[in-house]
Amino acid sequence: MNEKDSPLTLTRRSALMAGTALLAAVPLGFMKNAQAALPAFDASYPGFALADIIGDDSLERIQRKGEIIVCTSNDWPYSYLDANTGAFSGIDAEILLLAAKLLKIDKVTVQTVPFDGMVPGVLAGRFDMVGDSIHFSPERAKVVDFSFPTYFYAETMVVKKDSGIRVNTIEQLSGKSCGTLLGTHYSEWIQKAPGVQFKGYKDAEALVQDVASGRLDAAVYDLPVMVGLMKNNPQWPLEIVTTYQARTLKIPSNYSRYIFKQKDQQLINAFSRAIEWIQYSGQMREILKKWGLGEEAN
């Protein structure tokens, strides 16, 4: 029995599919629309097909155009333009480039914006999708739709070395300052914490540098980013708060996803089908391993 057919995989698949059905259900209005001609797909990938994709013709329009416009916050290690080569790189970049091949989309055009500008940019029609690591929230779900889950990671807290800060929660930082990137769900947590002074940032490096310089008491952000920044900048006097208990639990709603306009149901369903294939073919595991994420992320 291969991995795809194993009981363990089927159990996990059922859980993820249940989460996806709950969080990104297809509106009934689109279900009633007449189905357009089936979009093209690359049949050379075993087991991948779009035979029952429903909705409008949003994928077909992109296929005819030959290009999908993706926005990213240029955030290592997720989705960024390499400073040396200009290549679209990172965990999400590799997932999306493979998905584009599966869906016969000839060109992926990447545009960088601040994190809090990605969803507004999609809603305004400047981008076809958010191609960066982003999570479900009830507020976002009111205006956009989400793809099938991709991978998981939690947040961590970073402070200046020898600061003496040893807390379990953000709320225990009362009387101190705490920062994160604007537009993230972490920013919502910090702003709701009584007595905690919130400071928002446009990029993770500036966030962590303020902690290292003493301008900010603590930073809460994605564990992979924090570890990477500390590894690449050993001169910064930083440490992870080992007593901090992450609020991000490993459940379907906390997996990273991609964001689309609600009306683009064919495109959403097609990308979800491609991501599902990447998950259960084992390709996702290989991508995550390449970027230093272990089995806990899959």
Annotate the PLM regions.
Residues 1-14, 18-28, 35:
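N-terminal secretory signal peptides
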Residues 151-159, 227, 231-275, 292-298:
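Periplasmic-binding protein-like
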